[in-house]
């Protein structure tokens, strides 16, 4: 049978092999053009973006230090590794660590600094397995949990649950920050949610590993107690529901922290802990052994091809995009600098051209890309919804490159059904079960944020460039709307609204929107998973897609699309 089939497929000896024709699609399969680096626009963009990137790296370096010099010295004098050194010693040598929410808590509590929110979270490869790592930083307020610390810890667990990543908790915390207990303890997504998430993930066979390297007090004691497997460091790690001061106050009993909840007690008597470590290095070595014992196998739902570098240097993104959001650029030039071989199989290239859609690969992984090239019209929205459906049908992860002012407005567009067409795209994005990743590379305004998979639409990961802006609308537009409302109100009262009054009304509104739309304002509140250097976008996306594919891709069911 197979021989007969091969003979059918073999070309006849007398037939001539048809000459390969060149088509328009072949010519545009590789994206990108060489920018005019000598132009004033390119140079201005480059300088502005480079300044923002330099600021990003300076601020990140400060955050990475953690607590004060005195706090760090006190920490290391006890024989402890600093939290970032713990992570470096835990992950596989030479492998990257994809850190999240580095600017959590940035300028959030006034004069009270909480670098990185007092906790470090991210994905690292441990014994060959991609793991979510959550490390308390005891140099920042004793590792106590501020409201933003809780939010960041819970977000890390959400990422782990969505992507089925084993969790490793490097515990060194004094528990909840008591002066802020009202914002850390009672609500659904407060401190208790951490332990709820541990239980749920363990029930779904997502391994939970705790390494007690310092204090583990009160409710925090449940982190190791609810772990699948745990490790404690001698004369350093302690676990108790009530510390020595509270025990004395409640019972009059005087006891040391070591006798109350140290490694000897929990490894030899209580059975709360499983492995006895001599120091931090030994504890991390044991952790790697635990991960090796998981018998973990990653099963991909996609085909992976050999990776290719883009044809264009990544730093050209600085000159192409820039910091001026009023200056337009072709999102294809961005795509050309992040995808394999700068290859892009564009979908519906001639229709709804303010939205660019198509297929590419990043580090060999398939991805469907949706990028903005202007305001969204009905055609753009319908095209976007169609493309999302294709990716869901084919199990292809989605990447959204946001630079959007919103959907088109006006009488004619309302009459043509922009509301229902925009709703199609929003519904498709909402229901899509393939991994979704969003990068805000410019503006993210209003309903455009919804259609392009903003935070509310559960992207697995959401990143911002340092030039990005996010708000319900631009500051000038908001100020104009509110000034119009004020003018109309005055008119109804038979009063005038002077130009000076209008300017006085607008100025603080514009200033407030500028402040609240800033990426650092967003990142401080965990509206995103981190601000990234545009040059690092390709690597960050590759790591994110790889992590997302640890979870099986679920079938997508769509609801009603209003036609």
From Swiss-Prot:
CC per GO annotation: methylcrotonoyl-CoA carboxylase complex; mitochondrial matrix; mitochondrion
Modified residues (N6-acetyllysine): 70, 495, 511
Main subcellular location of this protein, as a coarse class: mitochondrion
Transit peptide: 1-22
Start and end residues of each stretch annotated as Acyl-CoA binding: 343-372
Cellular compartment(s): Mitochondrion matrix
Domain called CoA carboxyltransferase C-terminal: residue spans: 309-555
N6-succinyllysine found at: 70, 141, 433, 495
Pathway: Amino-acid degradation; L-leucine degradation; (S)-3-hydroxy-3-methylglutaryl-CoA from 3-isovaleryl-CoA: step 2/3
Keywords: Acetylation, ATP-binding, Ligase, Mitochondrion, Nucleotide-binding, Transit peptide
Gene Ontology BP terms: coenzyme A metabolic process; L-leucine catabolic process
InterPro entries, alphabetized: AcCoA_carboxyl_beta (IPR034733), ClpP/crotonase-like_dom_sf (IPR029045), COA_CT_C (IPR011763), COA_CT_N (IPR011762), MCCB/AccD1-like (IPR045190)
PROSITE patterns: COA_CT_CTER, COA_CT_NTER
Domain of life assignment: Eukaryota
Annotated Pfam families: Carboxyl_trans (PF01039)
Family the UniProt entry places it in: Belongs to the AccD/PCCB family.
Description of how the protein assembles with itself and partners: Probably a dodecamer composed of six biotin-containing alpha subunits (MCCC1) and six beta (MCCC2) subunits.
Identification of the protein by name: Methylcrotonoyl-CoA carboxylase beta chain, mitochondrial
Organism the protein comes from: Rattus norvegicus
Lineage: Eukaryota, Metazoa, Chordata, Craniata, Vertebrata
Gene responsible for this protein: Mccc2
């Amino acid at each position: 049978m197979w021989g007969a089939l091969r003979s059918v497929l073999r070309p006849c000896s007398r037939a001539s092999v048809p000459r390969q024709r060149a088509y328009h699609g072949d010519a545009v399969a590789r994206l990108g053009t060489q920018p005019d680096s000598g132009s004033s626009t390119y140079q201005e963009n480059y300088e502005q973006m480079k300044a923002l990137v330099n600021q990003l790296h300076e601020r990140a370096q400060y955050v990475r230090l953690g607590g004060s010099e005195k706090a760090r010295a006190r920490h290391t004098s006890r024989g402890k590794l600093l939290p970032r050194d713990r992570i470096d010693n835990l992950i596989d040598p030479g492998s990257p660590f994809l850190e999240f929410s580095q600017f959590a808590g940035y300028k959030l509590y006034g004069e009270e600094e909480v670098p990185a929110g007092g906790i470090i979270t991210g994905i690292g490869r441990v014994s060959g397995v991609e793991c979510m790592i959550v490390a308390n930083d005891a140099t920042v307020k004793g590792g106590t949990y501020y409201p933003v610390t809780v939010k960041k810890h819970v977000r890390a667990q959400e990422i782990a649950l969505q992507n089925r990543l084993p969790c490793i908790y490097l515990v060194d915390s004094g528990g909840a920050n008591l002066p802020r207990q009202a914002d850390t303890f009672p609500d659904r997504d407060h401190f208790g949610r951490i332990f709820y998430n541990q239980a749920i993930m363990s029930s779904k066979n997502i391994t939970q590993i705790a390494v007690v390297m310092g204090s583990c007090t009160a409710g925090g004691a449940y982190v190791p107690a609810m772990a699948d497997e745990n490790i404690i460091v001698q004369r350093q790690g302690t676990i108790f529901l009530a510390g020595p001061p509270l025990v004395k106050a409640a019972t009059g009993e005087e006891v040391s922290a070591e006798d109350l909840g140290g490694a000897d007690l929990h490894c030899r008597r209580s059975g709360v802990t499983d492995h006895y470590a001599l120091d931090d290095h030994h504890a991390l070595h044991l952790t790697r052994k635990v991960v090796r014992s998981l018998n973990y196998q990653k099963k991909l739902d996609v085909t992976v091809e050999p990776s290719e570098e883009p044809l264009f240097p990544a730093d050209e993104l600085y000159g192409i995009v820039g910091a001026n959001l009023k200056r337009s650029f072709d999102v294809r030039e961005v795509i050309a600098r992040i995808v394999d071989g700068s290859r892009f199989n564009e979908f519906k290239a001639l229709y709804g051209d303010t939205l660019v859609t198509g297929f590419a690969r990043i580090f060999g992984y398939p991805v469907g890309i949706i990028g903005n090239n202007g305001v969204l019209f009905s055609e753009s929205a319908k095209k976007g919804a169609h493309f999302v459906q294709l990716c869901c049908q084919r199990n292809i992860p989605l990447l959204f490159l946001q630079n959007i002012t919103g959907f088109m407005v006006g009488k004619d567009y309302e009459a043509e059904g922009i509301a229902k067409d925009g709703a199609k795209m929003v519904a498709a994005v909402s229901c899509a079960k393939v991994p979704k990743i969003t990068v805000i590379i410019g503006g993210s305004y209003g309903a455009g944020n919804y259609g392009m998979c903003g935070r509310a639409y559960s992207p697995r990961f959401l990143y911002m460039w340092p030039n990005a802006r996010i708000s319900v609308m631009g500051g000038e537009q908001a100020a104009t709307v509110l000034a119009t409302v004020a003018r109309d109100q005055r008119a109804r009262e038979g009063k005038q609204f002077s130009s000076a009054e209008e300017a006085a009304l607008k100025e603080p509104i514009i200033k407030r929107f500028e402040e609240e739309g800033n990426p650092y304002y967003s990142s401080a509140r965990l509206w995103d998973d981190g601000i990234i250097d545009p040059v690092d976008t390709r690597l960050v996306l590759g790591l994110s897609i790889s992590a997302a594919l640890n979870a099986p891709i679920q079938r997508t069911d769509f609801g009603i699309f209003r036609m």
